[in-house]
Amino acid sequence: MKLQLDTSLVKECRQAAGKIADEVQRFIGPRSTQSVERTVLRLMGVNDAIDGVPLANIIVDNLAARGELGLGAAYWLGNACKQLGLSPQEAAAKVAANELDLLAIPREEPGVLRPFLQELAQPGLRKIVDNRRQREQMQQKLKMGPAPLLYVIVATGDIMRDVPQAQAAAEQGADIVAVIRTTGQSLLDYVPHGATREGFGGTYATQENFRIMRKALDETGEKLGRYIMLVNYCSGLCMPEIAALGALERLDMMLNDALYGILFRDINMERTLIDQNFSRVINAYAGIIINSGEDNYLTTSDAVAEAHTVTASQFINEQLALAAGLSPWQMGLGHAFEIDPDLED
């Protein structure tokens, strides 16, 4: 079925949305957030935790408390790596153990240090590029199921119980498996570490949980001769960090929208729009498809009376996604409306 839409009106809507997106991008451009800074550290290889507290949080919190985050966490950690001959992970561990003060060692000028920082970032970026290439090769070899693709949700709270559910879903025809996050994870200002076996209404999004589920679905996909896509949720206070961890573990799709957190979680809109932009930059680079969250906006509203708000959001989301480098094929726009089927147009 093809909708006979007024193309001139669609063009006008896109132009209006583009103006809004341009204004947002001008605000985002010169700014960062603590989550963005933690993400950069994670991409440099700082992904361990001590007593459940991620090293990235320890470093960023330490710098922020001392008013020294303005130059960026990567600058301070990278400077220590260069001066002391340490890897980012080694330097971060020393900071966490109170064996190293990042502010107490000689400093390189930021411009002089930049090439070295780029070197430190290369292993993480290469890993993401390799994952993207591997996904493309596997999809070419195994193919995807016939359209429309079947999307199934699993979430027991225990990643070890999620795995057999996800594999069973794939064996019954699911092409895409989404693992819902535990209730309230969007309001945690850190990403839990390791495999988790207790969640509430969902399973924690962690790098290890991503790795476990990716491995399981790859094994099932090989057996079935179909590539099974893995989905998680990239929103809330750690939006860009989860994007980075998903990219490092070859997730295929992310729910990636700031507006739900603004409307329903009371998250600071300036912070979360900055976070959203960086998370979408990562998803664009990783070849990950994003889904926006317009269907969630309508859970407390009448779908017909407020349909125009969804359309407006979709146009704006499209323009913000393009500004972050996402290609049209990577954009999935939420549009699940709960409408009485007997309602006349």
Regions found by a protein language model. Name each.
Residues E270-V281, Y297-D345:
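Active-site capping/gating regions of soluble enzymes
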Residues P148-T156, I176-I180, R226-C234, M253-D257, ...:
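Hydrophobic faces of well-ordered beta-strands that scaffold small-molecule active sites
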Residues G221-E222, A247, M253:
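C-terminal basic regulatory modules in eukaryotic proteins
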Residues A166-A169, G246, V281-I282, L320-A321:
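Generic structural signal for hydrophobic
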Residues R133-M144, P192-M229, L273-I288, V310-G325:
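Alpha-helix-loop-beta-strand connector modules within alpha/beta enzyme cores
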Residues M1-M160, A168-G173, G184, V191-E208, ...:
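Long, compositionally biased, glycine/small-hydrophobic-enriched stretches that function as flexible linkers
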